[in-house]
Amino acid sequence: MLKSFRHKGLEDFFYDGTKRGIQPKHAGKLVDIIDVLNAATTIQDLNFPGSGLHLLQHKQANRWAVKVSGNWRITFRFEDGDIFEVDYEDYH
């Protein structure tokens, strides 16, 4: 279950549907990803086809990422079956 966000625009999109703080062309994919994140109870629940689920390293150690489009990713921390600090970023 989603517990917290880092990205204010993504948080607004999740709660209100406003696209002001996200790339509008990513809206459909973001809805799909957020729905899966919110329902997940294990990290394997997030390893759906095309997700590109991977554990980050270096300064983002202990965070996971799933692919949105191109270089855009949803990153988050997974702990005890919950999702924290959800971010929407182009980190490459």
Language-model region placement:
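Arg/Lys-rich, positively charged N-terminal/basic patches that mediate binding to nucleic acids
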Residues: 1-33
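A secondary-structure boundary/capping signal
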Residues: 6, 49-52, 87
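A short, surface-exposed loop/turn module that caps and links secondary-structure elements
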Residues: 41-64
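Enriched for short, Lys/Arg-rich terminal
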Residues: 64-92
